[in-house]
């Protein structure tokens, strides 16, 4: 998008902390991008079918959309189908195989991925250390990989 254009945010329920925080982080970053305009924000979606149904209405009401940020890979997959051939860039989160394939195929433009393995490992490690009485930080920042068509193969090779 070259740091300019019109975008939509399509998110899961704002009552779920993960979706709310993802939206907040995205909106905070957008303050640095004065030439990118958030045209519409919709929330409450987290499946394929709802996104496809809603996308026709969104495209009719906002015909100049250049991109969509969504808070769930599942939603992004539905959007990728609904916007196929439109040139609309899709950005999302979640490390799941079908979304990674969509990045490889160019249906999803960018994917923020955290290793589910690492999340599980660090969670159990925290619990075990806590039970042993080992003092540890309450927060642990895990690595996030930003995947595009250009680097997704490298990411896949690291996971092997």
Regions found by a protein language model. Give the residues of each.
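Structured segments of extracytoplasmic/periplasmic soluble domains
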Residues: 1-4, 29-33, 54-61, 82-85, ...
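Flexible loop/hinge segments that line or gate small-molecule binding clefts
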Residues: 6, 10-12, 94-109, 154-156
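Hinge/cleft segment of the Venus flytrap/periplasmic-binding protein
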Residues: 10, 14, 18, 29-30, ...
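Hydrophobic alpha-helical
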Residues: 26, 39, 44-102
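Short, glycine/charged-rich beta-strand-loop motifs at protein surfaces that mediate ligand recognition
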Residues: 88-89, 110-116
């Amino acid at each position: 998008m070259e740091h300019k254009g019109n975008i939509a945010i399509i998110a899961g329920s704002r009552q779920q902390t993960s979706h709310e925080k993802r939206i907040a982080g995205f909106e905070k970053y957008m303050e640095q991008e004065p030439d990118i305009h958030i045209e519409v924000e919709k929330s409450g979606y987290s499946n394929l079918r709802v996104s496809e149904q809603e996308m026709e209405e969104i495209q009719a009401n906002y015909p100049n959309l250049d991109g969509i940020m969504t808070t769930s890979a599942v939603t992004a997959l539905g959007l990728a189908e609904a916007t196929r051939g439109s040139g609309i860039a899709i950005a999302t989160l979640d490390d799941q195989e079908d979304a990674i394939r969509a990045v490889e195929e160019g249906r999803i433009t960018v994917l923020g991925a955290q290793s589910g393995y690492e999340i599980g490992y660090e969670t159990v490690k925290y619990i075990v250390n806590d039970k042993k009485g080992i003092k540890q930080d309450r927060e642990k920042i895990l690595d996030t990989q930003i995947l595009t068509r250009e680097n997704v193969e490298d990411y896949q090779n690291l996971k092997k």
